Each structure stands twice: as C-alpha cells, then as structure tokens.
Amino acid sequence: MTTPSMEDYIEQIYMLIEEKGYARVSDIAEALAVHPSSVTKMVQKLDKDEYLIYEKYRGLVLTSKGKKIGKRLVYRHELLEQFLRIIGVDEEKIYNDVEGIEHHLSWNSIDRIGDLVQYFEEDDARKKDLKSIQKKTEHHNQ
C-alpha cells in the first residue's frame, strides 16, 4: 500500500523518465522541492517495496509494478486537472487543488469523475449548459 508521499515520488519519477528517459535524485529533489537526502531515503524505501531499482550513482529504473502505478497516478492527476478546468476552476488554482485532493479520493471516485469528464467532452453543448447554470448561480450570489 502506498502513502501519499510515496505516490508523489512515484508519479514524479514516472513523469521524469517519460520526459527525459531517466530520473536522477537531483531531478526528483528539484521537481518536488525537497532535499536530495529525503529523495534518497524515499527511493531506498521504494526500492525495498519493489516499485523501482536504485543503484547509487547510477540512477533508478521503475519496475513493472512502479510503471503501472506511475502511469495510473499521472492519469489521476491529469484527469482531475481536466475536471477542474471543465467545471470552471481558475487556472492558477488548479494545480494546488489537485495536489490537495488527489490522495484523498478512492479509485472508484476517480473512475466516476472520469465518466463525468467524458460526458462533458463528448458534447460542447453540455459544457455551455454548465456555464449557463454557473452564470445564473453567480448572479444570485451577488
């Protein structure tokens, strides 16, 4: 079972490897704004739990288990960003909002949010209807 912190690391490592082809402790530390020694400790734990293989000074490689969960975590993050955009959350608030909620939702909830995103993406009229409702409620709340 992964903790929210483990998930943040796995997600970041997965994204770095997808983007650069590799992930170094220094890259992970910079991306997560943490000290390299914290990264080393977590990477050793993730190695022990078989999410990745870590060789000091040689970098790290995600195992198939690590890749699978990494892909799912990136999907969850991107889906939540897409959902918040659809419902009209201010762009500058989206990242922090996703970071605040992503670890607290069950995968069942994520799947249902995915259904909602798909529903809105399939027909632009649905997005327009939502915006119309939001305008009415904004008007009533003023």
Swiss-Prot record:
Mn(2+) 2 binds at E11, H77, E99, E102. InterPro entries: DtxR_MntR_Metal-Reg, Fe_dep_repressor, Fe_dep_repressor_sf, HTH_DTXR, HTH_tscrpt_reg_MntR, Iron_dep_repressor, WH-like_DNA-bd_sf, WH_DNA-bd_sf. The keyword Cytoplasm applies. Keywords: Activator, Cadmium, Cytoplasm, DNA-binding, Manganese, Metal-binding, Repressor, Transcription, Transcription regulation. GO terms for molecular function: DNA binding; DNA-binding transcription factor activity; manganese ion binding; protein dimerization activity. Residues 1-63 form the HTH dtxR-type domain. Gene3D superfamilies: Iron dependent repressor, metal binding and dimerisation domain (1.10.60.10), Winged helix-like DNA-binding domain superfamily/Winged helix DNA-binding domain (1.10.10.10). It is found in: Cytoplasm. PANTHER family: IRON (METAL) DEPENDENT REPRESSOR, DTXR FAMILY, TRANSCRIPTIONAL REGULATOR MNTR. NCBIfam families: PRK03902.1. Belongs to the DtxR/MntR family. This is HTH-type transcriptional regulator MntR. The gene is mntR.
